Amino acid sequence: MELKDYYAIMGVKPTDDLKTIKTAYRRLARKYHPDVSKEPDAEARFKEVAEAWEVLSDEQRRAEYDQMWQHRNDPQFNRQFHHSDGQSFNAEDFDDIFSSIFGQHARQSRQRPATRGHDIEIEVAVFLEETLTEHKRTISYNLPVYNAFGMIEQEIPKTLNVKIPAGVGNGQRIRLKGQGTPGENGGPNGDLWLVIHIAPHPLFDIVGQDLEIVVPVSPWEAALGAKVTVPTLKESILLTIPPGSQAGQRLRVKGKGLVSKKQTGDLYAVLKIVMPPKPDENTAALWQQLADAQSSFDPRKDWGKA
């Protein structure tokens, strides 16, 4: 049985750090991957590189491998390690060979530590109306299963029924403890993080905790004042347009914005004056009467002035 030179296989030095070894592994794994490589021995080389990475990527295993390499010419090492001529050593034999050469205590001391599972992050779209109250949502996602090389081996579908609290905001993260990937060697599971994405609304724009809505009004409604029906997230309200209102003017409706634990925002109605279509002869005459009555009014009087 031959103790392979894993450093030579990876093309690195024993003094190189994990980052350098990882870079070499990724390069060689891409080069010899059976699905893309045209090398005749690609599959064998790929397995050899993966085997070297499995040992050298683990701090404890690497230290033990270095110790084995250092003692490879000792008589005790040769008696234990070369018991089966013609067979090649691989990473799966590591535990048994190490404990045979260095004793049971060494095997116990090198057990891999408990490792926490990976966190998973998924985006959840929420409508503005749904932010007003707590609601239930069914979440489906794939739970990745990693192999010894840290690569995803398969994905297991998983479904959860979760509660989305009232008042969630865009970009808010909700933690579901232990719903990520399983831990290793008794380590805790990772977490599932729900990242809230507030879906765009056809009528409302979000400004902090407040909402803005553009309200179309006619010229005479703006001039004379009026009451118009305006939608909110809960219901429609009757909004008072004061006489002499201007285009772009913002009218505040208290308490009709977004809801959070700390405060409730307001709704701002932004007035947009909409002209009627091309006037007929009678309508044009009325506009002309208005123009004559307001002949002293100059809308550009202060134009360009600071």
UniProtKB/Swiss-Prot annotation:
GO biological process: chaperone cofactor-dependent protein refolding; protein refolding
GO MF term set: bent DNA binding; unfolded protein binding
SMART domains registered for this protein in UniProt: DnaJ (SM00271)
The keyword Lipoprotein is annotated on this UniProt entry: no
Recorded GO CC terms: cytoplasm; nucleoid
Highest taxon, organism lineage: Bacteria
Cellular location(s): Cytoplasm, Nucleoid
Keyword Cytoplasm attributed: yes
PANTHER family membership: DNAJ HOMOLOG 1, MITOCHONDRIAL-RELATED (PTHR43096:SF52)
Protein name: Curved DNA-binding protein
Organism: Escherichia coli (strain 55989 / EAEC)
Lineage of origin: Bacteria, Pseudomonadati, Pseudomonadota, Gammaproteobacteria, Enterobacterales
Gene name as annotated: cbpA
